[in-house]
Amino acid sequence: MRHYEIVFMVHPDQSEQVPGMIERYTGSVKEAGGQIHRLEDWGRRQLAYPINKLHKAHYVLMNVEAPQEVIDELETTFRYNDAVLRNVIIRTKHAVTEASPMAKAKDERKVAVAEVETNNFEDAEE
């Protein structure tokens, strides 16, 4: 089986459907004997340029190891799902399991906010 990186963008009005879509797509990969190495829901983000007069979209990143048949099925599903604005599927040489730069930056911000809140709480006690 080959390794793939999949990114798809969902219409912002359909953001509540994203967890169901992720579950469906990961389920089809696992049913075929594949593996999900990384799954990141980046949430609603600003687009670099408008697509269908939209300025935001809900982004999802998946790194999977799957047979070609599953990837073909996912491509077809993306093509006929009106909620999916854009998608890209790239074959990679190795499984990518580390967090993406987007996820790392998000985690660093959470840690920084937690430290600031802790410092403010300690200052208030004194």
Swiss-Prot record:
It comes from the Bacteria. GO terms for cellular component: cytosolic small ribosomal subunit. InterPro entries: Ribosomal_bS6 (IPR000529), Ribosomal_bS6_CS (IPR020815), Ribosomal_bS6_sf (IPR035980), Ribosomal_S6_plastid/chlpt (IPR020814), Transl_elong_EF1B/ribsomal_bS6 (IPR014717). The keyword Transcription regulation does not apply. Coiled coil: none annotated. Pfam families: Ribosomal_S6. PROSITE patterns: RIBOSOMAL_S6. Gene3D superfamilies: 3.30.70.60. GO terms for biological process: translation. Keywords: Ribonucleoprotein, Ribosomal protein, RNA-binding, rRNA-binding. One of its GO terms (molecular function) is structural constituent of ribosome. Belongs to the bacterial ribosomal protein bS6 family. PANTHER family: MITOCHONDRIAL 28S RIBOSOMAL PROTEIN S6, SMALL RIBOSOMAL SUBUNIT PROTEIN BS6M. Binds together with bS18 to 16S ribosomal RNA. NCBIfam families: S6. This is Small ribosomal subunit protein bS6.
